[in-house]
Amino acid sequence: LFGGCLFSMRAAVKEEIYVNHIADTVEIGNEFLARKFLVKNDKVRTCMIENKRMGKEVSRIIPETISEDFIIRTLSADSVVADIHSSDLFLQRVQVTDEGKNGKKLVFHYKGFRHQEVDWQVDMVLTLEEGKHYMRKYLEITVPDSQRHLARLDYIDFEPMSLPEGYAVWTHPVMEQGVGGVSGYYISLGQPVYIQGMFFGLEFPASETEIEGDRKVRIRYYSGKSFEMLASEGRLADSGTFTTWKEVTGATRSTDMDVIQTDFFSYIHDISVPVDFRIQYNSWYDFMLDINENNILDSFREVERGLTQNGVRPIDSYVVDDGWNAYGPWQEENKAKFWSFNSKFPNELSTPSDLSHRLSSNFGLWLGPRGGYNYYIKFARFLEENGNGKLNCNSSDICTNHKVYCEKLKMFFLDCQQRFDVNYWKLDGFLVRPPQPD
């Protein structure tokens, strides 16, 4: 089972990552945390997750035996659901390799199996980097090329643990009313959960992560896509393997909420992309929808004059907000039957773009993918009538995942990018409610 792999005993050097195989257990860890698996009768399950950051008091999570390491829910061609439980799979072999700089990768290769007329191959992968207080877990899933159209993922549960009573836990509050017109459900997506001074989450911003009744953990990624669709989107490797988003398990120094959040944000700092401070002018604050070429040019000049006189460097972008599209009162002018420029901009945006660059700055542009905020219902119907999009009947706006709409929007972006040298896009509003089924 463990042929071809070398398993080191717990490292003498504190910072070294180790993978141990002792009797019926396999453990991966470092000085901050560890995860131990019971491997018996070709079955694998997590038997302990350990937090070593709390000083002398080591904190351990011992999942109930009914817990799973993952559940994959699939959909057949006629939408019949069926689940693949990690506990139902048989282990073929375990592999340990180096990962990155002084990191380790632990892979549980399961034996292939047939499920809903599809031949599946699933691997569970864990990675741990040197000096990090968190580790990652993800799946690699493969099906034959000829069966991709049959293999459809409904969702994946990454950590379906059942917890013993009395554990210190936190999950997001119920926010039924939402904020600012956005539902509480959407706002809560992507939040971590805290268990015994450890944080758990998925590196996907719209994951459904929560603890039900203080006992049942859910870290769920909804897909709804077949492997054929994933291949068309470039989500499969050359080998045909789909690599899921990565689940993260992190150790903190206390069960105190402030400390947990501090250590969680330390992880966020590690993965975040640096954001540079930008100075911009946006036409919305002066004119809202009442922009035209003349008042835009006047504003650009006035802003530049005032800032220069006060020693401010050239700003990063002059941005034209809503009011340029041929919809609402200007829809009859719309010959493109798509996003296009109304008669208030006879030169489209060439003149404002040219001025922004002559002011030693750059040009930015607004677009609301779901149809903006004032004329979205009528505009969505207009696009659908002309074969350039689809009305989302559940939210009375544009379906932002419609293939024709997305392709035409991409071409519009590229055209504006080239002709107006856009360096900043304000993409305003993507989704209110999922659309009706086709």
Enumerate the predicted regions with their spans.
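Bacterial Sec-dependent N-terminal signal peptides
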Residues: 1-15
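Acidic-aromatic substrate-binding/catalytic surfaces of carbohydrate-active enzymes
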Residues: 23-116
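Carbohydrate-recognition beta-sandwich/jelly-roll modules
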Residues: 32, 36-38, 49, 64-66, ...
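Aromatic- and acidic-residue-enriched carbohydrate-binding clefts of CAZyme catalytic domains
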Residues: 274-277, 317-319, 323-352, 376-404, ...
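Active-site-adjacent "subsite" loops/lids of carbohydrate-active enzymes
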Residues: 277-278, 285-289, 293-294, 362-420
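Hydrophobic faces of well-ordered beta-strands that scaffold small-molecule active sites
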Residues: 277-281, 316-320, 363-367, 425-427
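Surface-exposed amphipathic alpha-helices with a cationic face
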Residues: 304, 350-360, 368
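Active-site groove signature of glycoside hydrolases
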Residues: 313-324, 410-437
